[in-house]
Amino acid sequence: MATISIGAEKPNVVVIMADDLGYADLSFLDDAPADIKKIGTPNLDRLANEGTYFSASYATAPICSPARTGFITGRYQTRWGNYWYGQGGLPTSELTIPKALKKLGYATKKIGKTHHNGGKAQHPLKHGFDEFLGFIHHTWDYTRLSSKDRDAYKKAGKGKSLGILCVGPLERNNGEKVSLEDAFTTEVFTDEACAYISQDHGDKPFYLQLAYNAMHMPTYVVDQDYAKKVGLPPEPWDREAASWTFPYFDPRNGPWAAWHKQWGHLGKVDPLGRKRYLSHLMAMDDGIGKIMDTLKAKGLRDNTLIVFLSDNGGTINTYANNGSLRGYKYMFGEGGIRIPIIVSMPSKLPANQQKSTIVSSMDLFPTIMNLAGGKVPENLDGKSLLPVLRNQPSGQRHHDTLVWDKGKGGCWVVRHGKWKLAHNAGWTHSDYEFKNGEAVAVDAPFTYPDGIQLFDLEDDPRETTNLADQHPETVAELTKLHTAWRSQMSKPGRPKN
C-alpha cells in the first residue's frame, strides 16, 4: 500500500481504550439512556465533536485479550491461534503499532491494562513500548494499590486465590513495584498520561497508549468522590480488618470461581451496580478531559491524533448499557462485538462527523501509519480509515466481510454487507431490569439463539428475525466465506514465542 502524504511533521498519537464500555453509554448519542444523559460524558462528547464517531465499528473478539491483540497488530489474532481465553498470547514476532512507530523515530509508552494473556512474553516492553506503568493481568483493583492491601488479602485469605485477586502495587517498566495509598487507578493513569505528554521528548513525536481498567469488574470498588455524585452511600474501608462485603469477593467465604459464577453471571444482582458503573464512567470521562486540556495547553492538540475505543462490548455483570444492540461481552451478538470508535486530529481530519461505515479496530494500525508517514505492512487485515474520514469515494464501502470465531464448537459469525450469519453462537444467562434506578433480577433469562441464524442488520439491527430459511443462498455464501477465512487461520493454541 502506498504511503499517503500528510506533510513533514509527524503527529503525536494518543490511543485511549476503555474496558467493557456499553455501546450506548455516551451522552452525545441520540438514544443514550436517561442516566447517561443526566450525568453526561462531556469530554467524550467534545472529542466526538472534534472528530469522527463510527457507529458500526467492531472489535475482533467479544472478550478482552484477543480483542486487544487484534487492535495492536491490525490483524486477526486468530492467525496465530488466539481465539478465546486460554488460547491467548501475542507472539514477539508480530509487528505492533508501537514497534512500527519506533522505526519512524517515535517515543512510546503504555499506561494501564495490558492483558495479552500469555505470561512474561506479553509484557509491554517486549512489544515496542519504551516505558510502562500499569498491570498485565485481566483486571486490577481500583483503589487497593498498596503493599498493605496485598498483605491484608494474604492474611485474610491465608494465601488462597491470590493470583487472580489482582490487589496491590502497580508495575513500572520491567518489574518495579509502585505502591500507592489513597489512590484511584483512573486518576493515577490519567496523571501519568498528562505527565508524559508534558515532558520534553526532544525532537521525537510520541505514541501514548492508555488503557483504563474502567469499567471492568470490580466496579464495586468506587472512588468516594465519584460515588457521591451518583448517589452511592458511603462505603468505608478498613484495611486492617480486611472486611469485604457483597459484592466484593471475600477469600474467606470460598473460592473465586464460585463467587464469580454467582456475581459475574448475575446469580445475585447488585442493586447499586449501575450507579457504580456510572461513577467509573464519570471518572474516566474527566480523565480524558484532562488529557485533552493538557495537549491544548502544551500546544500539541492540533497535531495530535486521538483515538478512543472500547476493547469489546459492554458486559452485563457491570451493568453496562448496549442500547438497542442484542447481547453483551462474551457473545457474538452485536452488543458483544460492536464498539464505539472516535478518531480526531484537528489539523488533518474533518470534525463533527458520524459514520455508519463498517469498520474494525484492526483499521487503526494502518490509519496511524498513514498519518505518521510510514509504510503500511502488506500483511495487515485492517484498512486505513483515511478515505472514510476524508469522505473520499473509495471510503464508501470499507470492509466487505468481517469474521469472528470462538475456535471450538462450530461457534462463528460472519458479517457481509447488510447480512450477518451466526452459527452455533447461542448464549443464555440471567438478566435484570431497573426499577427506581436500582437493578433487580427478572425471571426470564436473556437468550441469544443457537443453530443457524441469518439477520438483515439494516432492517433488523437488534437481530430478532431469523431469515435463514428465506435466504438459503445467502447462508451458503456466508458459510463459504467463513470456510475460506478459517483455512487461513491457525488452530487454537498459545504461540511458541
Regions found by a protein language model. Give the residues of each.
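Bacterial Sec-dependent signal peptides at the C-terminal "C-region" and cleavage site
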Residues: 1-9
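Active-site environment of divalent metal-dependent phosphoester hydrolases
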Residues: 116-120, 315
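Active-site-proximal cap/lid insertion segments
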Residues: 18-38, 46, 55, 85, ...
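Short active-site alpha-helical segment characteristic of glycosyltransferases
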Residues: 97, 113, 364, 385
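Short, surface-exposed beta-strand/loop micro-motifs that present aromatic residues
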Residues: 98, 196-198, 410-416, 420-422, ...
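Short, well-structured beta-strand/strand-turn elements
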Residues: 105-117, 372-381
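Active-site segment of extracytoplasmic enzymes that catalyze sulfate/phosphate-ester chemistry
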Residues: 15, 23-110, 119-120, 124-132, ...
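Loop/turn elements at helix/coil->beta-strand transitions in domains of secreted/extracellular proteins
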Residues: 9-14, 50-55, 103-109, 127-130, ...
